[in-house]
Amino acid sequence: MENARPAPGEELSPGAETVPRLAATVILLRDEDGLEVLLAQRNPGARFMGGAWVFPGGAVGAQDGEGEAALRAAAIRELREEAGVRLPDPAALVAFSRWITPAAVRIRYDTWFFLATLPAGAALEIDGAEVVDARWFVPGDALAAADRGEILLVFPTIKHLEQLSGFGSAGELIAHARRQTVAPVQPRVLGTGETARIVLPGEPGYTR
């Protein structure tokens, strides 16, 4: 399907496999019109995923420290920088998933996705540089908007929204996440150029 394509600006590697860089992302939740999630629009002028609507996040930096604490520090920092939302402490984050960029892609990330609820009284304040807009979406509504061509979503965001659409509230989702063990997911890219498509473990073609 069209959504199972590499992201805009995501170059396939012609040579040796590159080492993925650690990154952290926050799936920020609130209960408004049912469960809603925050999506931020990357600057359309960005070389990588320009114009795409994504969960706030980014690479782990030296200032974030080491180990799991660094992942949580990076998640909190990126959410603050991109959306202006300050989480009270690292314990506010609940690990949800871990996605590793396909080996065929030149720039790779080992990304941890964390859940968090919007703190009481918090307001959005986008940076206007890396992020140019941010909105709350019911997960299914975001997927429908992408199908209509109104917003651009990339493969990992689509797959997470599909999963989130099965939950009715932030509390239900977080309770589910606390019960599960996070296992890494590493998609594969099959084909090249216009024929390139992404497959997940267990899907036809993954083990070729």
Residue ranges of predicted features:
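N-terminal leader/linker segments that precede catalytic domains of diphosphate-processing enzymes
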Residues: M1-V131, R135-R208
